[in-house]
């Protein structure tokens, strides 16, 4: 138990250090600017950094980024193999977070390495995958046949407004995950993560350590 506490303490220090800039690099000017960037089509997003991202699934494709005017050139947004990759090309420190707004016709996957807040709405597809390493906060709403979540670190993932027929969750670390699954839920937990579910699915679970699988209380109960 002492070893686990030490690991979590060190992890927290690393996350806080990254957020506030132990190696700050370029200092933000404080002058906010909004850029629109033209991008090729993509079906998945990879975020490496501490960005606040809002994604809406709709017919048109658009990308807008807001932040300090001298910081925006340091953020790379490239599409390769149908994946939009968002990352820093140089370290920086800022007083307000970088804000990214995206609309995309079809989003099938999200990969996050780092922190930040990500909100995805309007999904309607056959499968949606989330793979994250770090301490992001993620919210997703819409409908899908299969939701597949793989986490390590201290993620907070709220998909209880993403209606799915099947859910697959593999959580390592101290994550908190909330899902809405109708038919089948497969859960593997390693460590003190908590998975909460809504619905009445058939459950297959494997839990190593103090992790928990809990049914969400009915609203208004």
What are these regions (language model features)?
Residues 1-4:
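Positively charged n-region of N-terminal signal peptides that target proteins for export
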Residues 14-17:
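C-terminal motif of bacterial Sec signal peptides marking the signal peptidase cleavage site
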Residues 19-91, 97-103, 198-199:
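Short linear S-[DN]-x-LW-Φ motif typified by the pepsin-like aspartic protease active-site region
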Residues 35-36, 42-55, 92-102, 106-221:
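Extended, compositionally simple hydrophobic/Ser/Thr-rich segments
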């Amino acid at each position: 138990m002492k070893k686990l506490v030490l690991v979590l303490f060190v992890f927290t220090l690393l996350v806080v250090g990254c957020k506030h800039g132990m190696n700050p690099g370029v200092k933000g000017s404080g002058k906010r600017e909004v850029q629109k960037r033209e991008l090729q089509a993509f079906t998945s997003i990879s975020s490496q950094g501490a960005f606040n991202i809002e994604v809406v699934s709709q017919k048109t494709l658009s990308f807008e980024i807001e932040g300090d005017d001298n910081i925006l050139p340091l953020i790379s947004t490239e599409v390769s193999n149908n994946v939009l990759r968002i990352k820093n090309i140089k370290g920086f420190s800022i007083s307000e977070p970088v804000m990214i707004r995206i609309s995309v016709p079809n989003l099938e996957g999200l990969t996050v390495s780092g922190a930040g807040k990500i909100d995805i709405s309007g999904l309607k597809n056959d499968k949606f995958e989330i793979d994250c390493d770090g301490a992001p906060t993620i919210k997703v709403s819409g409908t899908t046949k299969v939701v597949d979540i793989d986490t390590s670190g201290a993620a907070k993932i709220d998909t209880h407004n993403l209606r799915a027929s099947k859910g697959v969750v593999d959580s390592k670390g101290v994550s908190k995950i909330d899902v809405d699954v109708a038919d089948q839920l497969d859960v593997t937990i390693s460590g003190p993560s908590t998975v909460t579910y809504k619905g009445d699915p058939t459950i297959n679970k494997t839990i190593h350590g103090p992790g928990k699988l809990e049914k969400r209380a009915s609203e208004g109960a």
